[in-house]
Amino acid sequence: MLCLRWCNPFLGQAGWLICFWHTFYYLLHHENMIRKIIYGVYAILGMMTMAACSGQSDASEISLEKMHGFPTENTGFLKGVSALYAGVIEGNLLIAGGCNFPDIPVADGGKKAYYRDIYIAPLSNDTAFEWKKIGQLPQAAAYGVTISTEKGLICVGGTTATHSLSDVFLLSLQKDTLKRETLPSLPVTMDNMAGALVGHSLYIVGGNVNGIPSSAMYMLDLSDLSGGWKRETDIPGEPRVQPVCVAQDGKLYVWGGFAPAVEGHQASLSVDGYMYSPETKEWS
């Protein structure tokens, strides 16, 4: 069981420094030199995360626990999948699609398999999930973006075994029945991107655009779908495949990402981050 708990989010900056030094002191006296360095970095990152979370004054306890149970209908799926569409809908955890190498590992030349099934599991205080298949994606796909909204989960783009996607649709539950509503398609195909919701505006950033690593950003106003997707200001720096994106206080934040080598451009790894203001349409 993996379990990480801290019970007082009000320690403040000094409190987190004390926690950090206690953790680092323990590592120095109980691990060999290589592990000291590695765990020391983990400790710093962990305490930074705790400090960031400490501003949530409505939380008295934060916990991370290992959950058990996985859909069993597909034997290949049982080996674990990555890059699936996922989110919480009507008190249920929903997962859809995804991919893996079910037979031969990628290092040995295995072929990647993509999945189509959609499963839900009720959220409870138990650490075991009870999954139920409730539908299928239009096609087996992975590496898209899933955004939780009041109406359901919006699935954007992604890729199949043969091609990238521009499809956008809303998944919702109505009397335990899965419904799928088509939304305006992206003007390009996109996969391995990130996204977040700022107010009624859905932003999709980075990834592969028409098969090429990109720093582009697109926005869809969910309160006016007739306007379709609009191109917004590109993220500064190099193209960003698989970046991290989050919305906070009316702003959009993007970190990291990479870009493989393509004709005319060397491979790159982005270790910086930027904040986007929808009001000024500028990054800083």
Describe the role of every protein-language-model region.
Residues 3-5, 35:
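Basic polycationic patches enriched in arginine
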Residues 8, 22-32:
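Intrinsic-disorder-associated, low-complexity terminal segments enriched in Asp/Asn/His/Tyr and depleted
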Residues 12-15, 40, 46:
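Residue-identity detector for glycine
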Residues 25-26, 42, 188:
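Short, low-complexity segments with poor structural confidence in diverse proteins
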Residues 32-41:
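Bacterial N-terminal signal peptides that target proteins for export
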Residues 51-52:
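C-terminal motif of bacterial Sec signal peptides marking the signal peptidase cleavage site
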Residues 57-284:
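Kelch-like beta-propeller repeat domains
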